Amino acid sequence: MADDTTWGIANVYASFNNTIITVTDMTGAETIVKSSGGTVVKQNRDEASPYAAMQMAEVVAEDVKDAGIDGVHVRVRGPGGNQQQNPGPGAQATIRALARAGLEIGRIEDVTPIPHDGTRGPKNAGF
C-alpha cells in the first residue's frame, strides 16, 4: 500500500514574547498559511502563551487541510544567537494542537541558530 500523504513544512518560531507559525510546501519556497500570537489574543503578554499557540494551530490546521496537505514536518526554532537557546512555551502546545487537529506529524527538528563563538552576550558585557 503506497503512502499518499501530501506533506508540508510547519516552521514554528517560539520566543518568550510571541509564537509564529508558517506552513510552506516541501521546498519551502511557497508559503501556504502563516499566523502569529497577536491574531488570536488581545493582550500582548498572552501572545507567547500555550493557549494562543493552540488556537493558532487549530486555525492553521484548517487552512492547511483546505490546501490539500495531510501531514507536516515540524521545524521548531527558539530565539537563538546570543539570546536564549530553548524555545518558548508555545512550541510544545503548537505541535500537540496540530496533531490533535488531525494533521499527521512527520519529523520534528530543532533549528535554533547556535553561535560558534560569535559576539559577546548582553549579560557578560561588563568585563
UniProtKB/Swiss-Prot annotation:
Keyword Transit peptide included in the entry's annotation: no
InterPro entries with a match to the protein in the record: Ribosomal_uS11 (IPR001971), Ribosomal_uS11_archaeal (IPR019961), Ribosomal_uS11_CS (IPR018102), Ribosomal_uS11_sf (IPR036967)
SUPFAM superfamilies: Translational machinery components (SSF53137)
One cellular-component annotation, GO: ribonucleoprotein complex
Signal peptide: none
Annotated keywords: Ribonucleoprotein, Ribosomal protein, RNA-binding, rRNA-binding
Name of one Pfam family that matches: Ribosomal_S11
Top-rank lineage group of the source organism: Archaea
Entry's Gene Ontology BP terms: translation
Entry GO MF terms: rRNA binding; structural constituent of ribosome
Annotated family: Belongs to the universal ribosomal protein uS11 family.
Function statement: Located on the platform of the 30S subunit.
NCBIfam families found in the cross-reference section: arch_S11P, PRK09607.1
Subunit structure: Part of the 30S ribosomal subunit.
Name of the protein this chain belongs to: Small ribosomal subunit protein uS11
Organism, scientific name: Natronomonas pharaonis (strain ATCC 35678 / DSM 2160 / CIP 103997 / JCM 8858 / NBRC 14720 / NCIMB 2260 / Gabara)
Gene name, Swiss-Prot/TrEMBL: rps11
